[in-house]
């Protein structure tokens, strides 16, 4: 696609955004956008890599009827803190849990303060480009956030100290030579164990004689020390890594295989999930509520729900043998789909509701799911359930669809870390677009009581 074609496509999407902006806000419990103002010297070009993550902090102003929810926003090597102003009471799960009447929100003064504030970097990972952040607020090591750069280096940041207090550095590698073939899509990821004592970091293969690797990093005693390095031969990169608990973590690589690893067990996976149907597997997530529930997403837009016990039973004997055999002989519990076969790039379970999940498409669109209707059917007809659900049930499970008037599709940057899902405020989501526009919203799902069942869904 030529530069002129891209410009024309973006122009059309901007016009669609203007139409959406006028008509759609009624489908949200709350939605607001902010274009931050930065001090001099900040690189604001659309090609600059951006990522966002919510903190766990919040502060309320009862007289104004508003809640301030901080968001960390990385742009290039710098991290900024942005106050997101939302209505007081948005953090309540149900209206009946509100103990006293709430003041009608007055955004004027509070929003203007935020909009007119010139942001200066709170932290800086000098000489690096930040790809992802994890908010930890770990009092034991006195660290607020850990940042991963595009070449696999790590930085630990402390409140009130602009430079990292700890680092784990990797040799500099030109993004243009990355095996992913796209300078805007560095294939690095990291994760933290449930007890916060261990980090895992991936590094992609750059030369023919190299392997993609996983490093286990100390996050409690000798912070930043490499505990183990695991080479993963036969692949170019690992696009996602997550802990299932303190001892087991899993990876998803460019060959579409999910590998499960033990913290202290050898250099081969314990089990694998090799699912080649519905496109290549691109991402995964494990439920924080049900330890047997596991989800994967594919390049063809399928979101699959698995019983991890079946995966373990199949892959327990010889993981490497199963890789060579191709598709695993295990079936998912059920599957649903993104619109227009949009690739599933990220899956995130709610930490509040066991049935709710947010998924991110390859174009940046955000899907909100509530699988309560599916599991209700599954429990009723468990013996006869074959993993195939009706179109009506799938539509009911998709609670909300956020496109920002197709604005989320503008730009070529990796969209995986441009969406943040709040840990404690149900359904609160933030997005950052390629031009730096921040949007914070909580969807109105359109559900109304109909006897004992809730029906309806909203799309935007």
From Swiss-Prot:
Catalytic component of the RPD3 histone deacetylase complexes RPD3C(L) and RPD3C(S) responsible for the deacetylation of lysine residues on the N-terminal part of the core histones (H2A, H2B, H3 and H4). Histone deacetylation gives a tag for epigenetic repression and plays an important role in transcriptional regulation, cell cycle progression and developmental events. WD repeats lie at residues 233-271, 276-316, 339-379, 411-451. Disulfide bonds: none annotated. GO terms for molecular function: histone binding; transcription corepressor activity. It is found in: Cytoplasm; Nucleus. The keyword Heme does not apply. Present with 3040 molecules/cell in log phase SD medium. This is Transcriptional regulatory protein UME1. It comes from the Eukaryota. One of its GO terms (cellular component) is nucleus. It comes from Saccharomyces cerevisiae (strain ATCC 204508 / S288c) (Baker's yeast).
């Amino acid at each position: 696609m030529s530069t002129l074609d891209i410009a024309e496509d973006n122009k059309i999407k901007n016009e669609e955004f203007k139409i959406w902006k006028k008509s759609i806000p009624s489908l949200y419990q709350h939605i607001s956008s902010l274009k931050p103002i930065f001090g001099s010297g900040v690189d604001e070009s659309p090609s600059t890599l951006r990522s966002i993550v919510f903190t766990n902090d919040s502060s309320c102003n009862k007289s104004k009827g508003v809640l301030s929810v901080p968001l960390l926003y990385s742009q290039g090597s710098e991290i900024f803190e942005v106050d997101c102003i939302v209505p007081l009471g948005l953090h309540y799960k149900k209206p009946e849990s509100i103990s006293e009447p709430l003041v009608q929100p007055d955004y004027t003064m509070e929003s203007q303060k935020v909009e007119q504030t010139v942001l200066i970097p709170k932290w800086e990972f000098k000489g690096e480009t930040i790809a992802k952040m994890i908010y930890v607020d770990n009092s034991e090591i006195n660290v607020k956030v850990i940042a991963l750069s595009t070449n696999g280096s790590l930085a630990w940041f402390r409140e009130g100290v602009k430079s990292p207090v700890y680092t784990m550095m990797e040799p500099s590698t030109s993004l243009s030579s990355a095996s992913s073939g796209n300078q805007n899509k560095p294939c690095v990821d990291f994760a933290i164990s449930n007890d916060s004592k261990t980090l895992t970091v991936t590094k992609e293969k750059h030369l023919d004689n190299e392997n993609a690797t996983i490093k286990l990093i100390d996050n409690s005693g000798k912070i930043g020390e490499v505990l183990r390095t695991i080479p993963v031969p036969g692949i170019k990169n690992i696009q996602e890594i997550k802990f299932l608990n303190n001892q087991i973590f899993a990876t998803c690589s460019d060959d579409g295989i999910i590998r499960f690893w033990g913290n202290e067990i050898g250099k081969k996976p314990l089990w694998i999930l090799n699912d080649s149907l519905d496109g290549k597997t691109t991402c995964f997530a494990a439920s924080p509520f049900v330890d047997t529930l596991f989800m994967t997403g594919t390049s063809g837009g399928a979101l699959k729900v698995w019983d991890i016990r079946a995966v373990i039973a199949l892959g327990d004997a010889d993981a490497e043998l199963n890789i060579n055999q191709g598709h695993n002989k295990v079936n998912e519990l059920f599957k649903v789909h993104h619109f227009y076969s949009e690739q599933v790039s990220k899956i995130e379970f709610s930490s509040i509701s066991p049935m709710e999940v947010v998924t991110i498409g390859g174009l940046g669109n955000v899907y909100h799911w509530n699988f309560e209707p599916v599991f209700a059917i599954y429990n009723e007809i468990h013996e006869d359930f074959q993993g195939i659900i009706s179109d009506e049930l799938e539509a009911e499970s998709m609670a909300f669809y956020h496109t920002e008037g197709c604005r989320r599709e503008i730009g070529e940057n990796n969209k995986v870390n441009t969406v943040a899902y709040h840990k404690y405020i149900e359904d609160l989501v933030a997005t950052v677009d390629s031009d730096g526009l921040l949007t914070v919203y909580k969807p109105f799902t359109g559900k109304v009581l109909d006897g004992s069942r809730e029906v309806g869904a909203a799309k935007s």
